[in-house]
Amino acid sequence: MTAVTAVTRPEQTDRTAVSTMDAAEVAIAADAADAADVIVLAGGTGRRLDGASKPDVVARGLRLLDHVLAGLEQLREQGLPLGRVCVVAPPEVALPCGVLRALEDPPLGGPVAGIAAGLDVLGRSDPVAGLAGILTCDAPLSWRALPALHRALVQAGPELDGACAHDGEHTQYLLGLYRRRALATAVAPGGVPLRDTAVRRALGTLRVRAIPTTRDAVRDLDTWAEVRAWDSGRSE
């Protein structure tokens, strides 16, 4: 099955989207320190996908971005204290109502700059969650790692700045949950966002615990071959 790209959708304005924002505010108000906002990185050039808009690539019947957003709502319904969701993406990527948008200025500054932009947008809302999750749209099942990361970070207390997925070989800093203030300091030291900076260089300064994570959660889709394999249900 061949994946389809550049799907456009109107902004959604249904009651479900409104109730999602209400649920985010309730989750944060209940215990702001342990509530988690989530930043989904959905920018970039899509170079290995022939320039396609990666969040709009369709596989298994949904855009890659929508797999992540739907998964987050599933976790919310299961009781994980999720706050607001902010997608770092250009204006042409359609987002559901209730999902915030951010974009580094100028665009294409790299994921570290994208995280800083997302934190800036989330920080304008009140109340503000104490934790911030980082996911990427090209890992459509990455949301499955969040409950274990949340448990690890909350149980550890202030001695840890974050908890990240580990794929058996590497710590995946872009699949992680962090204390908001520590993350903000790492990506925007002195309040100035870093640009074109390696993720490991910026986030590697934080005190994080690597949590073993299932293969499906860390699997990212960077090429058409990987998209087609995942779309068809093949392991590779």
Regions found by a protein language model. Give the residues of each.
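Nucleotide and nucleotide-moiety/phosphate-recognizing core
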Residues: D31-D196, R201-A217, W224-A225
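Short, intrinsically disordered, low-complexity terminal/loop segments
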Residues: M1-T2, E236
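Intrinsically disordered, low-complexity segments enriched in polar/charged small residues
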Residues: D14-T20, A59, A184, G233
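Short, basic/aromatic-enriched C-terminal tail that caps enzymatic domains
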Residues: V218-E236
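N-terminal nucleotide-binding beta1-loop-alpha1 segment
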Residues: T2-G51
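Positively charged, low-complexity intrinsically disordered regions
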Residues: P10-T16, E77, V85, R181, ...
